[in-house]
């Protein structure tokens, strides 16, 4: 049966999360969860995933900030029914584990046109982060730069460094901050563009977008229907009167 429904599915904090964020997570969602750490689904999240995964009409497309290695750590990435995924905030689209060549070329050209390349931005980050042992700096496969604070890092210390890092932002980049992580990404790394690309490629009869954060909302707006978890950050967009 033809998969004429596309579900663009954000992963972290939508389909699963760490125990620290939700103690009700009981179903391992990542390889590392089997060892007692990592991410888990609640019973409700597991049932929702099964609902779509078991339907022959639905093509699930994980739409995530995770890099390739982190995506491979998820258990759903091993499903033979999930062949396509959007990774690195849309920096890469994979089909059966192989990068989509047309999209890869498009992204490569966008990076070449940056006035401030990732390599130079990394140098600027290093100058500010190297003297702070409670933070770790990541060059995420040349796609973007992330700084993560240790779990025991005081909030005031975290906020202070992140405020300094915000001054490095230029018109070519935007800030993405999530819990203990601070990232600077080029504006073209946007899930909505990859979603639009795949909708045009597959020409589905129905599209669904599922996400929890404000940064997910633009890609969800490309879809016919949107699914939002309870108590999601996205709820702040709506002023609902009881």
Residue ranges: model-predicted function:
Residues 2-60:
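Active-site neighborhood of HAD-like aspartate-dependent phosphohydrolases
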Residues 9-21, 88-90, 96-98, 140, ...:
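Short loop/turn segments at strand-loop or loop-helix junctions that form parts
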Residues 41-126:
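Active-site phosphate-binding/coordination module
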Residues 70-73, 194, 218-219, 236:
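Phosphate- and divalent-cation-binding pockets in alpha/beta enzyme and binding domains
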Residues 124-208, 214-222:
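Conserved acidic, metal-coordinating active-site core of Asp-based
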Residues 211-215, 230-233:
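Short, polar loop motifs at secondary-structure junctions
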Residues 222, 226-242:
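Asp-based, Mg2+/Mn2+-dependent phosphohydrolase catalytic module
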